[in-house]
């Protein structure tokens, strides 16, 4: 499979554009927002220097494995958030990356919380990873108590596969309950697509002949009713 440069992606409401230097203000604003960061990393907003480092890392994801990278999402021209397909280091060498597996993540502006944008962008990441990149697995991680992020992963078809515990110099509140890893394989994702694909094939035809069938039955009943009424009125 030939992997082209990181493409612009689209969903029903989002235009997902490859992250560029011109988007640094957007990513930094999210990373320095206390509400956004309370269940991420240190559990506190990043400093300006830390936010710059995160933006640099997000940019570098596009050079790690062909097709991977970060996308910034816009709805009707307004910045919504970012989504990333990040590289997963190999067990043999942390400086080399697996080409069949990715870890996805996202941040969404609080203005757009509760409107389905996080899941909409995440589903497109999963679709792109399997359908266009041909990857074998997509994983995601978050704090155990971060139920919103867990709901997004579950909504994309990922299932909980592991709870783990890391040690942090400055542990965020709630980290004592651990972190969770979710996963979905390409085969699992493909099985999820088959029912919807089947429905999309038969529904248009079904929708076209169902009204005709009902109308035919209705006319038959009316006609039969008239005959019975006429027979009852006959001497």
Swiss-Prot record:
EC category: transferase
Single GO MF descriptor: acyltransferase activity, transferring groups other than amino-acyl groups
Induction of the gene: Expression is induced during iron starvation.
Keyword Transmembrane: no
Domain of life of the organism encoding this protein: Eukaryota
InterPro entries the record matches: Acyl_CoA_acyltransferase (IPR016181), GNAT_dom (IPR000182), N-acetyltransferase (IPR051531)
Disruption phenotype: Eliminates TAFC production and increases FsC production about 10-fold. Does not affect the production of FC.
Function, as annotated: FsC-acetyl coenzyme A-N(2)-transacetylase; part of the siderophore biosynthetic pathway. Aspergillus fumigatus produces 4 types of siderophores, low-molecular-mass iron chelators, including excreted fusarinine C (FsC) and triacetylfusarinine C (TAFC) for iron uptake and intacellular ferricrocin (FC) for hyphal and hydroxyferricrocin (HFC) for conidial iron distribution and storage. TAFC consists of 3 N(2)-acetyl-N(5)-anhydromevalonyl-N(5)-hydroxyornithine residues cyclically linked by ester bonds; FC is a cyclic hexapeptide with the structure Gly-Ser-Gly-(N(5)-acetyl-N(5)-hydroxyornithine)x3.
Protein's recorded name: FsC-acetyl coenzyme A-N(2)-transacetylase
